[in-house]
Amino acid sequence: MTYLLAVKHDSLPLTLHQGFARAFLIYSALMAVWGLFLYIIGRPPSGGYLGALVLDEGLALLQGVVGLVLRTQGHAPHDALHYLYGVVAVVSLPAAYYMSDEGTTRRDSLYFGLAGLFLVGVALRGIGTGSG
């Protein structure tokens, strides 16, 4: 887990990419806890929670854009699976929303909470395959 804290370079895009990865990991964990809490107490996703999920998606997209900038500058991840984890990070929340009842039922809280938990795993794998 020390790779979560290590910064070994002076490239601004790379520093941003690593920082956004950590932010995405933490934020997705918070979204998982919040969604599962809503499910446990029997409530559908609140407007605030749905808005927070949009921010999580925005962070995933921003991470992807910075990753593309890095690629154009000649940087490459340690493992090519890193690209797959990036795509999965971007499509997971829209997929969960597509499977849901548009955020109106208690079950949707479960879907979004589990999607957040899944994204924690995706973020950890993305960090692991990007570092080298």
Predicted regions and their residues:
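Structural signature of hydrophobic alpha-helical transmembrane segments
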Residues: G19-Y27, A76-A89
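N-terminal signal-anchor/start-transfer transmembrane helix
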Residues: F24-G42
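Loop-to-helix transition at the N-terminal end of transmembrane alpha-helices
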Residues: P44-A60, L81
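A generic, lipid-embedded transmembrane alpha helix
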Residues: D56-L70
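Transmembrane alpha-helical segments of integral membrane proteins
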Residues: G64-G67, V90-D101
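Juxtamembrane boundary at the C-terminal end of a transmembrane helix
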Residues: G121-G132
